[in-house]
Amino acid sequence: MTEEATTHRRRFLGRMFGAAAAAGLSMAGTATRAAAQDAGADDWIKEVKGTHKCLFDFPTHNNGMPLLHIFNFLNTYTTAYKTAAGQAGAVGTLYSAGQKSSIPLGFNDAIWTKYEIGAYLGLKDAAGKPYTRNVFNSPTPNDLHLLLGALNSPNIPALSGVMPAMAIPSLQKMGTKFILCNNALGLWCLELEARGKGKAADIDKELRANLLPGVTIVPAMVIAIEKAQEAGIRYNRQ
């Protein structure tokens, strides 16, 4: 491909993504944008406590492996480094779109049931049925096969106890802040509309009303990652 052709392709993709992002942003509504501005787009950074802080960047869910890595980070500081409570903090990023994305992790069981998120992500319970609940919000020892599947590993019963420990609420209590990309949310709503799940604007409104507690929507993940580094939060790509 010539340099001229490459440049043309980049411009085309840029315009296409820009149009999609703009459409997604428009669905947020004036009230939502105003509320976000009043609250401060970067106020979430203040919720990341401690002297040891790291952002875990995971656009894909990878069967929950990024959550395990966050747990490992926080737990190791406590157990091996004897760090006092509140001295280690983490950030988890929920964004992207498509059937491997991490963005569905930010929503409650009602959304997972209505939009058949388990089937959408290709995640099945121990009985082989698609999950109808957000398994990453309330995992049990019986969900260990998800992690082991990501590792292509046979069953290791001794690891089953880690599943409840890496639940989103558990990680939040340990010092993790989860953020969700507004631009990616708009794109995902358009995707769900294309899949016949309803009108994108209606989907957007419902998703925002069913966020997990403590999850904050940020204007753009690419900016949030930059802002985190400016604030001294380390970066870990998953």
Language model regions located:
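Loop/turn elements at helix/coil->beta-strand transitions in domains of secreted/extracellular proteins
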Residues: 51-52, 86-90, 173-177, 231-233
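Solvent-exposed loop/turn segments at secondary-structure junctions
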Residues: 61-63, 96-101, 178, 183-188, ...
